Amino acid sequence: IGTKYLWTAAGWFDFLNLRVNGYDFHMGLMDGNISYEDKRLDKVFDIWGDLARKGYFIENHASLSWQEGQAPMLNGDAAMYLMGNFVVGNLQEGGLTGKIGYFQFPVIDGNVRTWEEAPTDSVHIPSKAKNKADARKFLAFLARPDIQSMVAEVEGMLPTNNQSPAPSDEFLKIGFKVLSESAGLAQFYDRDTNPEMAKEGMKGFQEFMVKPDREKQIRKRIEKVRKRIFKK
């Protein structure tokens, strides 16, 4: 992993919280309705901290971008990477074609349904656009099932139109199955919560992965930000 740009650390938090506490709790936290010092988050940080203390994350990840974080995978020093399908092409070009696979983020509590992360990119018309009529036609064109499939294939993503043909890429096929069978979808920490909250929260997550023994101080600091932003 490379956490220099923070959002990759948030992916770990999201998945762990979704697996431990479920979607409703997670979104309540994203909406600012739940404290970051809530005891239900203790297990999330316990599991995460245990991984960090045992050295399961590469060293110096806070100084690496997610792109630079691919190097340990390519040179054989790392075995797994929590990352979107868009990384597959890079790994294959680096010599791992036929040598990598995919598995769903593990279940932690069998009583909690499997919610997944599936951030969705969207295209919009600016409110002050001069030619909205043609812009709407272009959006309609982009939304067509066949066009969605073309765009998704180039980007290494899944199409958002459920009428689009099934993807041919083996990893996208598995991803499509996982998302289709999930209880529901979260977008991602920095999309699901207030932008300022996300920035401060992700800074805390990155610090926690480096210094898990600072958990209490980090959560207290993040909680202070939550109270200021959401006034709850």
Identify the role of each PLM range.
Residues K54, E93-G156, K203:
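Extracytoplasmic/periplasmic substrate-recognition and gating elements
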Residues N60-L74:
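Short helix-initiation/N-cap motifs at beta->coil->alpha
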Residues N75-M83, G98:
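Alpha-to-beta junction loops
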